């Protein structure tokens, strides 16, 4: 599968990308929602999007809404470590705007792969 990973934290992106590549997935990375949306529009063969919710330039919720306008059926996994209001609140909002699944940071590689398996 081809998976787009959108997260402003390079260490989180690297962890996710390495986990996915070890399972023979193809990974495209973006450091914010603006870049992620651009890559999604350019690379039409993406199967799943994993996006952080709190990022500079364009937050994950806005990114999810815009992606849904382009492709209502693409699978989206929203991830969040929270911020001031706590990750649970952000993840509920992600669900409300169209994420197919949510995962609270920090998470293990095994938890990530289990979530992706549910999206397949």
Identify the role of each PLM range.
Residues 79-81:
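Hydrophobic/aromatic residues positioned on beta-strands within the core alpha/beta folds
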Residues 55:
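Receiver (REC) domain active-site loop signature in two-component systems and cognate sites
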Residues 52:
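Active-site residues of response regulator receiver
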Residues 62, 83-103, 110:
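Alpha4 helix (beta4-alpha4-beta5 surface) of REC/receiver domains from two-component response regulators
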Residues 10-28, 97:
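Two-component/phosphorelay signaling modules centered on CheY-like receiver
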Residues 6-7, 30, 49:
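Conserved sequence signature across two-component system core domains
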Residues 31-35, 59-63:
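Acidic catalytic/metal-coordinating carboxylates
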Residues 111-120:
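Receiver (REC) domain switch/output surface
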């Amino acid at each position: 599968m081809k998976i787009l990973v959108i997260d402003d934290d390079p260490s989180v992106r690297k962890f996710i990308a390495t986990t996915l590549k070890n399972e023979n997935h193809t990974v495209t990375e973006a450091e914010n929602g603006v870049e992620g949306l651009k890559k999604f529009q350019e690379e039409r063969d993406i199967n799943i999007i994993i996006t952080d919710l709190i990022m500079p330039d364009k937050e994950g919720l806005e990114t999810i809404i815009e992606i849904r306008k382009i492709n209502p059926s693409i699978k989206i996994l929203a991830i969040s470590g929270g911020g001031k209001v706590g990750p649970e609140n952000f993840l509920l909002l992600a669900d409300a705007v169209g994420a197919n699944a949510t995962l609270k940071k920090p998470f293990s590689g095994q938890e990530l792969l289990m979530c992706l398996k549910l999206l397949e």
